């Protein structure tokens, strides 16, 4: 019976680890041509999709729903059907709303600091007279790793390949808004592709 008593605690100890693995969300988008909101320039196709609902957010971020906290994730898929490598390291993307206002993307590392509570640390301190160890700690709803791991990070895109990831905007989504993208270059010549202006169709 002793081996049995030793086995039970071991199973209990390992159970949380297995539970955590089950909660991991694997994300893979559909082929670029399957998205209604897309545009093709010079044999390069870009598709975009706003993740504004809880169901959509669940497929990419698990329990996290960024739009609930004022952050709109926009999935961007780039399909390179040219015979040249594309440089994406200077890609510029803006959200154009129904009023014509252009909103810059919020860097993934800055997203947690857009909600009330945490402040980005600075060399001069944060101005709060209460010592950090005495402050009441609140869990940041946007402080998990999903925001950064899902962010668009590709710097180069080989021929006949695709890259995808999320850009984050402090914007209110409406169908008819659009995504403006430029500064995609041909790596060999440095020539910039024509800009993309992609309206949301859903």
Where are these regions (language model features)?
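Sec-dependent signal peptide recognition
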Residues: 2-9
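Hydrophobic h-region of N-terminal signal peptides that target proteins for export
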Residues: 10-18
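Conserved functional micro-motifs across diverse proteins
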Residues: 19-202
């Amino acid at each position: 019976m002793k081996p049995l008593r030793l086995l039970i605690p071991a199973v209990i100890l390992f159970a949380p680890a297995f539970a955590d693995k089950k909660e991991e969300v694997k994300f893979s988008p559909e082929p670029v041509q399957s998205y209604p909101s897309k545009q093709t320039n010079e044999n390069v196709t870009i598709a975009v999709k706003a993740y504004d609902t809880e169901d959509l957010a669940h497929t990419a971020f698990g329990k996290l729903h960024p739009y609930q906290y004022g952050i709109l994730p926009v999935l961007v898929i780039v399909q390179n059907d040219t015979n040249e490598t594309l440089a994406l390291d200077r890609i510029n993307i803006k959200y154009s709303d129904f009023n014509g206002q252009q909103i810059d993307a919020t860097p993934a590392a800055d997203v947690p600091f857009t909600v009330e509570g945490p402040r980005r640390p600075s060399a001069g301190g944060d101005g709060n007279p209460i010592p950090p160890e005495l402050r009441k700690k609140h869990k940041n709803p946007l402080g998990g790793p999903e925001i950064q791991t899902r962010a668009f990070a590709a710097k180069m895109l080989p021929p006949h390949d695709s890259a995808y990831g999320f850009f984050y905007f402090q914007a209110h989504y409406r169908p008819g808004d659009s995504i403006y993208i430029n500064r995609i270059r041909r790596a060999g010549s440095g020539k910039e592709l024509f800009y993309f202006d992609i309206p949301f169709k859903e």
